[in-house]
Structures are given as C-alpha cells and as structure tokens.
C-alpha cells in the first residue's frame, strides 16, 4: 500500500477517534505497526493532530469568541478559562519531562497499547454503568479544583492506548460531572493540550523531517480536519443518547484483535 494512502487512512482515523474515548494515538500506532508505516521520531501521529485541533476550534469558534469577549465582565467566563489552564498544566510538566521515554519506549510497544485499550474499555464500561448522581451539568460551573483534578487524569493519557478524552471524561464522571458536560470539557481541554503537543513535537523533531514526510503529514492533516469536524458535530448527541458503552466495547475489541495479531502465529 502506498504511503500516501496509509497517511490518508491514518488521518481519517485520527479525526474520527481523537474526540471519543478510544485513544486516537493507540489506533494510529497499531495501524502504523501492522501496515509497516513509520515516521521519524514517531512525529506523524502527533503532527496530524493539527487537523483535529482546527476542526474543534472551527466548530466551537462562536463559543470561544464569546468566552474571550466576556472575560473582562463575566466571572463565569474567567473561571472557565482559568479552569482550562489549570487542567492543562499537569500534562505540560509531565509530558515535557517524559517526552523522550514516551516516544522511544511506550510508542514502540504495541502490546502495551492493546493492553491499555482493553483495561480502559472495562473501566469506561464500569463508569458508564455506575449510577453517579451528577452535581455539575455545565462546564462553566466546574470548580477550579475539579478542573485541576481532571487535568491530573489527563496525564494518564500520556501512555498510548489510554485515551486523552477517555481519561478526562472518566475523571469528570468520578467528580460528579454529567456525561455531556464531561465530554464538552474534554473538547475544550483538547485545544491547548493538542496544540502544545504539536508545537513541542515539531520543535523536537523538525530537523528529522524530509519533504516527503511533510507531504504525508499534510495529507493526514487534511483528512483529520474533515473527519474531525464530523465527529465534533455529532458525538455529544451520541453520548447523550447512548452513553460510553459503545466506545468501551470498541476499545476492548480492538485491543483483543491487536493482541491476537501480535501473538498468534500466522
């Protein structure tokens, strides 16, 4: 299969999975492994996230603009923005400190990705079935302490296969946030987190990228942008109707199939 087609497929997968709790990075690493696709420093999986970043920023532009323009006058807007920044900080410190270990060890261990997909699937399924009475139904109501703790949960997603959205949503549910607002907070937190990961990874690996790499990243970026817009516009209603169980079953299935492909002789 030509590299450009693999890049297109991986870009579509990135956009389709980035904002749902199934681990986009886990899917990209497993697909790349089985398709024989490798990028210098494992940068492709991170850099095509720019498409997903633009997708969610475009869909939520009106909401973002409203927050920014009301910052001087609305205490609720200020608290929400501060909460997002507090939730973002833990991943900055842990991500920078562990960056090389994550990229050279964890990203190169497909069995770990499969295992975390399965374990995370069972955890998500358990949380979905728990009858937790929500205390918060609007992201603007989240206390700063709640936002910061959700940010600590996000650090778990530095392990590929855990899922950034899955970790933050799980943390929010345990902190008595309802499903829809938990997913929405995860969306907003994704913007600085993914933008930061993109910028730092580009800084660390810019000298390793060739013209061909940039072309493949461009294809993946565009595919992630298009598929990401579709998911962001539809996933909140899907979660409201169906909860997180479908994503949990998908994670478990992908993890089991991945382990089978890795260890069953062919």
Swiss-Prot record:
Q: Where in the cell is it found?
A: Cell inner membrane
User: Cellular component terms, GO, for this chain's entry?
Assistant: plasma membrane
Q: Name one GO biological process term.
A: cell wall organization
Q: What class of enzyme is it?
A: hydrolase
Q: Which residues form the signal peptide?
A: none
- Enzyme Commission no: 3.6.1.27
Q: What catalytic activity is recorded? A: di-trans,octa-cis-undecaprenyl diphosphate + H2O = di-trans,octa-cis-undecaprenyl phosphate + phosphate + H(+)
Gene Ontology molecular function: undecaprenyl-diphosphatase activity
What is the protein's known function?
Catalyzes the dephosphorylation of undecaprenyl diphosphate (UPP). Confers resistance to bacitracin.
Q: Which PANTHER family match?
A: UNDECAPRENYL-DIPHOSPHATASE
Quote additional remarks: Bacitracin is thought to be involved in the inhibition of peptidoglycan synthesis by sequestering undecaprenyl diphosphate, thereby reducing the pool of lipid carrier available.
The text of the family note is:
Belongs to the UppP family.
What protein is this chain from? Undecaprenyl-diphosphatase
Q: Which organism is it from?
A: Caulobacter vibrioides (strain NA1000 / CB15N)
What taxonomic ancestry is recorded? Bacteria, Pseudomonadati, Pseudomonadota, Alphaproteobacteria, Caulobacterales
């Amino acid at each position: 299969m030509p590299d450009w087609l693999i890049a297109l497929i991986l870009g579509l997968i990135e956009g389709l999975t980035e904002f749902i709790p199934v681990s986009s990075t886990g899917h990209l690493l497993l697909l790349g492994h089985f398709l024989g696709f490798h990028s210098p420093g494992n940068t492709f999986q991170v850099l095509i996230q720019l498409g997903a970043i633009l997708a969610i920023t475009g869909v939520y532009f009106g909401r973002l603009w409203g927050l920014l323009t009301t910052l001087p006058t609305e205490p609720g807007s200020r608290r929400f923005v501060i909460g997002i920044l507090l939730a973002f900080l833990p991943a900055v410190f842990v991500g920078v400190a562990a960056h090389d270990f994550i990229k050279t060890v964890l990203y190169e261990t497909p069995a770990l990705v499969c295992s975390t997909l399965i374990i995370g699937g069972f955890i998500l399924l358990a949380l979905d079935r728990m009858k937790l009475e929500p205390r918060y139904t609007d992201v603007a109501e989240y206390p700063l302490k709640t936002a910061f703790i959700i940010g600590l949960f996000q650090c778990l997603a530095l392990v590929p296969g855990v899922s950034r959205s899955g970790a933050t949503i799980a943390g929010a549910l345990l902190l008595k946030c309802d499903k829809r607002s938990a997913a929405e907070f995860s969306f907003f937190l994704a913007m600085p987190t993914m933008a930061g990961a993109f910028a730092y990874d580009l800084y660390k690996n810019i000298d390793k990228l060739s013209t061909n790499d940039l072309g493949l990243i461009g294809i993946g970026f565009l595919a992630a942008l298009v598929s990401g817009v579709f998911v962001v516009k539809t996933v909140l209603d899907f979660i409201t109707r169906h909860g997180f169980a479908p994503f949990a079953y998908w994670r478990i299935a992908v993890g089991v199939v991945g382990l089978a492909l890795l260890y069953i002789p062919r």
